[in-house]
């Protein structure tokens, strides 16, 4: 479930308040700040994702509400991350033309037609990391805006090789990230230098080589 609250509701005293009413078996996985024109992106452990406008969220009158459905989950699936994206109103045809032109220009924005320059300048990227150390980086334009509560689209192809998704986060190509495994190993790397941009339906590339019984448990974008 997902809950929208106005900022005035977040005046919390030192004893705390219930922010959202959780059903049995449910848990809170994240809290983000958004503005009216943002989109919300949810990602699941089985490689599904949904993107919808914040205007689709009803503002609740107070803390402690149960929220509304963000994505329809399969029986064995669960949401693992949430992030905000810039809202865009581009058509599917324009989006596809831009992504094709960018691929042909081999990521060199200076070679892209002038009509696509604004899209290039506002482009965002989504990085998905799996438990077996794989990373998949895609343009946020790959994810169309849909209605809240649907089943979503494929965010990453999940296989026994790459494992289930542990997190999807918004990044820039020049960002550094840190991955940590359940054995305490840590890897720091640059996004653009180590993970190439691919289409939405891909299993990604190996970023962190884990041992047979080792799993990645957390990833974070590092501040400069």
Residue spans for each PLM region:
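Active-site-adjacent structural elements in folded domains
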Residues: 24-28, 36, 79, 109-113, ...
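A structural feature that tracks compact, well-ordered secondary-structure segments
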Residues: 8-9, 31-34, 39-63, 69-71, ...
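Internal, charge-rich low-complexity segments
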Residues: 76-109
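Generic long, charged, amphipathic alpha-helical segments
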Residues: 149-172
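Beta-propeller and closely related beta-pinwheel folds
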Residues: 13-36, 151-159
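Intrinsically disordered, low-complexity acidic Ser/Thr-rich regulatory segments
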Residues: 108-127
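Single conserved hydrophobic/aromatic residue that forms the stacking wall/gate
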Residues: 1-7, 12
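Hydrophobic core positions in small helical hairpin nucleic-acid-binding modules
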Residues: 22, 99-103, 219
